[in-house]
Amino acid sequence: MYKRQHLRYGTSGLFDEGSCHPYLRRTNWPTRTLMVLGNFNMTNTPELNQRMIERGQHPVFGTDTQTVLEEIGYHLDEAHTDLYRALRDSGMPGPEIPHAISSRLNIQEIIHNSAKQWDGGYAIMGAIGNGDYFCLRDPHGIRPCHYLITDEFIAVASERVPLMTVFEVESEQVQELPPANMLSIKADGTHAITEFTTPLKPAPCSFEKIYFSRGNDPIVYRERKALGAALTPQIVDSLEDRFDKSAITYIPNTAETAYYGLLEGLRVYRRKRVHAQLLEALRNGTLDENMLDSAILKRWPRGEKIAHKDIKMRTFITQEKSRAQLVSHVYDLTYGAVGPEDVLVALDLSLIHISEPTRRS
């Protein structure tokens, strides 16, 4: 049984039902029927469409989704036709030919031929009408892709955590599909992971890894905390040790983990500073109760929840025509948490562009 689900939003194209994945290429031959879905952006879509035109095809749309679907479909047709003619000419009865084609169809070769000219980041999944399945990842590893293989099932997802949660497994059981590799599964359940092209220099997308990924992934969580902690020296220099008159906060919600990392980094800095001050006073004989109170009880980093955002409201994926209205009321502030003499330090993890409606808000 093959099940698929696609929850990614479109980065281009139209906001209508017809633009949703998966895309289908139907025929009355199971081994020529194709379904494609995934997380990808091709950087050379015009060139790929021109290649189809020079081949004699007539692309109806200029999207990379159509390009991927039609390119794989073309090489699938070629492989199917070659097998059909060979089997027909060998004298095999017509009703037996579809099953023979299905068993002989080489998914790896089809994908290898299809992806020769692709340039971009992609994690693409697809299925053929006979029950064969494939999943491939770009040679730079720009888009994330993970898989889980057990005795009962094979599952694939962009991120590690959904597989861990749904199938109740440990993180070590979920593997990352290497760049330039594909997972192919035949209809009979046999499967393989093979290279379909040459791996290139690793270049994972920071948007995918830091902003868009689920924050409860163990690796992503550590990376986000480290990202916040790395800001510690800059914050210390800008505040000049005035922690008692500073409030640390974050925006948007995805910045929360990095915010914890920043607070942790600032507290480690403060502990080291206090330790050094106390040691120096102890050696000089100037350690007294007032100094202990000043060093231990005062000037520690203070965190505040300043910006409140309705987590159900996604301004980033809202269409431009309604974004201004949504942004104007999706955020609110905590009143009275910051005084007129306080310095507000806001950790902003927005890796996307700030639209004009956001600036106005």
Each language-model region and where it sits:
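Residue-level detector of conserved catalytic or cofactor/ligand-binding positions
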Residues: 2-5, 349-360
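Conserved short alpha-helical segments that host acidic/polar catalytic motifs at enzyme active sites
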Residues: 3-178, 184-247, 251-252, 337-340
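Short, glycine/charge-rich flexible loops or terminal/linker lids adjacent to PRPP-binding catalytic cores
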Residues: 14, 264-344
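Short secondary-structure boundary/capping segments
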Residues: 52, 140-142, 150-152, 262-269, ...
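Internal, charge-rich low-complexity segments
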Residues: 57, 61, 65-90, 259-288, ...
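A short acidic (Asp/Glu
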Residues: 135-138, 146-147, 256-263, 355
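Hydrophobic alpha-helix feature that most strongly marks membrane-spanning transmembrane helices
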Residues: 232, 236-240, 253, 263-271, ...
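C-terminal substrate/ligand-recognition segments
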Residues: 255, 343-349
